[in-house]
Amino acid sequence: MSKNNPDNNNLFNKALSNKNEKNKFFLDTAGGNSSLVYFGKDNFIEIDCVRLDTIDIPEKIKLFKVEAEGFEPEVLYGAEKKLNNIEYISVDFGSERGMDQKNTVIEVNSFLLSNNFKLYKFSNHRTVGLYKKDSLE
């Protein structure tokens, strides 16, 4: 990161959520599916979660990428006040939520459409959507 942008590095050891609180982060030791949503594995660690709205970040954001293993709605709800300053949002909302492995397509799509984003591109291969803000404030 310092090579690409040496004067503007801010790292936060926090998970994004819709609440500022400690939460269980369930660990998947056999793959990359660790999540804040219980998916049948009892091994977890306690982590600090924060709303993106509470973090001092640059005024304008070109791309906000959300890949939260089924926790995408909560991440976006916690970013609601920042949405007016984000041009693009990429969301991986595949079948990863909880023990039933539900997708979050309908909930995420409804939320983003109601916040003046339009679905720009969609990939069935990985269930990823790219949304573009109608107009930035």
List each model region and its residues.
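Phosphate/nucleotide-binding beta-alpha loop and adjacent structural elements of enzyme active sites
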Residues: 1-137
